[in-house]
Amino acid sequence: MTSVNEHSLLINNNENNDNNNNHINQRNNKNNINNRNNIGVNNNNNNNNNNNNNNINNNNNNNNNNNNNNNNNNNSNTGKIYLRKKKKWNFRKKILPMIVILIITAIVVCLVVFSLPFDSSNTIYNQSPFVIKEDDNLLELAMKSRQNLLNIHGNQTISKLDFAILVSNPIGYWQLATFNGKNNSNPQQTLFLPLLAAAVNWCMNQNNDPHCLQTAAGPMMNDMSSIHAGILMDIITDAPNQEFQTSNSTGFQSWLTKRESIELFLNSFNLLGNQTIINKFYPSNSGPTATWGEGLIQKLMGDNQMCPYDSALLMLNLVKSGILSEGQSYMTDLISRQTFSTFTSIGFGLPPGTTLHSVLGTSSSTKDLNEIAHLVLPNGGEMIFSIFSNGYENFGHAPYQSSILGNFAGDLIRSLGIDIGCPNKIVMTSQDKNCTVTGAPWTLDTSIQAYNNSFLYISGGVTPTSTVTWSFTINVTGLYEVCVWFPNGDLHTSVSYKVEPGDGMIYYFPVDQVHYGARWIRLDSFFIVAGNQPIISLSNRGIDPSKTVVADSVKLTRWPSSKGIPGFSNDFVIAESPE
């Protein structure tokens, strides 16, 4: 676990530079650059030495002239001896001022040194424009939320959850908590975030608008297209795949240097760390797998590698204009996401009306589930999550294959109290007095996956047909999001939730209760007038006798409202980005 430092800290330029230089200097083609730099340094040192020698010779000549003058004076004053009177040190005029100056200097030095943030290794951190402080309480609560998720879903669903979390503090800094924050993993499609930043940087260096590569960048981010990601990499590196046979082939080293331009760009802002960002994401525009030069790179450098900590810093710099400020609006537009969508995982734990910027990376074969996300809650609370996990669940029923991290995010937000001031929510369990059963009785059972550790169930085919009904009373008119919660179960089946908002309309929503339990499943959002009593119900009608129906909890959450517009949040209006 990452040690937490009581001192405030800024991002470690010195440590990052060492790590970044070690990473970049692994490339053989950098040796020539280093040699040229060394030659330049040696030339400068030689020039300085020559200048110093000249100065010494001049001083010696001056001393000789002074000695000659003194000898002449002595000769002209032959026979006369003058005794020089020894001066006394005056304490008030000489010694006391020197002591005062020394004391003032010592005080200034101490103030400067102790005002600098240090890490546990006494390394000074300094990266403008963000002040970041490791926070004990944030780490403790994040670890509890992490453990809760692992306990509920077990090792079969998820066993890895590395994270870096940043929370905006109202007094002007970011709180930080990390767990395995520097551990590298295959980023999958989260690679597209640094690739997008490099594309905007390329456009600006060409004196073009930041969105000059939108034709490729748009499909890459909107459709997660690896083909367009490959096209984009070829353009900004000016190094499309070539038919090199070995790393000693003519031209390979110069081609490799071009391919490293994305890493060099990140390194220039101290955002690379020990990450490897040089390979395409396959299948790509150059083939289904890495071949020729791209194959050689993959053998030499290994797979792409990213970590939660440096990924979180990249997202922070992009959305808060730490770098590429002219392209900030364009980039945030491209990565704006809806909660409960295929483009996010933590979004399944966020209240409606949340502003979400996110890049998601998944793999069916390795179960990788990675997300780099920035969010602003309806109350203005702001956070950055960078999570690398193995919680991808390939059971179909989009968008819930990637939904598991929503529990972690939602639990942590509630624990921190960051959601205080957001629109109200109502959670009703099967044990609430306003949850009623009509027909045959349901059986009460317990499970760690149940919302409040208890739930009701009934088999299909039981007569008479039985229904569980959750009845709500609405006191504030508005747009309400309706979600349901239930535990997993192999004997469960697909059911149909019935929603009656109170306006005379009836809606049915099929939900698979076999998979994707122990999380909030959104049915839809409904406009409900104050005084109405919306009803959500679940029945065993038409269910196979060998299967069971589970009734657990229902949640209604009101969307934010502004200027009389239901669902409108002030954060929906994008402020002018800084120049």
Swiss-Prot record:
<dbReference type="InterPro" id="IPR012338">
    <property type="entry name" value="Beta-lactam/transpept-like"/>
</dbReference>
<protein>
    <recommendedName>
        <fullName>Golvesin</fullName>
    </recommendedName>
</protein>
<feature type="topological domain" description="Cytoplasmic">
    <location>
        <begin position="116"/>
        <end position="578"/>
    </location>
</feature>
<feature type="region of interest" description="Required for membrane targeting">
    <location>
        <begin position="95"/>
        <end position="118"/>
    </location>
</feature>
<dbReference type="InterPro" id="IPR033803">
    <property type="entry name" value="CBM6/CBM35/CBM36-like_2"/>
</dbReference>
<feature type="region of interest" description="Disordered">
    <location>
        <begin position="1"/>
        <end position="79"/>
    </location>
</feature>
<feature type="topological domain" description="Lumenal">
    <location>
        <begin position="1"/>
        <end position="94"/>
    </location>
</feature>
<keyword id="KW-0333">Golgi apparatus</keyword>
<dbReference type="GO" id="GO:0000331">
    <property type="term" value="C:contractile vacuole"/>
</dbReference>
<feature type="region of interest" description="Required for transfer to endosomes and contractile vacuoles; the protein is trapped in the Golgi">
    <location>
        <begin position="559"/>
        <end position="579"/>
    </location>
</feature>
<keyword id="KW-0926">Vacuole</keyword>
<keyword id="KW-1133">Transmembrane helix</keyword>
<dbReference type="GO" id="GO:0000139">
    <property type="term" value="C:Golgi membrane"/>
</dbReference>
<dbReference type="GO" id="GO:0005789">
    <property type="term" value="C:endoplasmic reticulum membrane"/>
</dbReference>
<feature type="region of interest" description="Required for targeting to the plasma membrane">
    <location>
        <begin position="1"/>
        <end position="75"/>
    </location>
</feature>
<dbReference type="GO" id="GO:0031164">
    <property type="term" value="C:contractile vacuolar membrane"/>
</dbReference>
<feature type="compositionally biased region" description="Low complexity">
    <location>
        <begin position="11"/>
        <end position="77"/>
    </location>
</feature>
<dbReference type="GO" id="GO:0005794">
    <property type="term" value="C:Golgi apparatus"/>
</dbReference>
<dbReference type="Pfam" id="PF25275">
    <property type="entry name" value="Golvesin_C"/>
</dbReference>
<keyword id="KW-0812">Transmembrane</keyword>
<feature type="transmembrane region" description="Helical; Signal-anchor for type III membrane protein">
    <location>
        <begin position="95"/>
        <end position="115"/>
    </location>
</feature>
<keyword id="KW-0735">Signal-anchor</keyword>
<dbReference type="GO" id="GO:0010008">
    <property type="term" value="C:endosome membrane"/>
</dbReference>
<keyword id="KW-0967">Endosome</keyword>
<keyword id="KW-0472">Membrane</keyword>
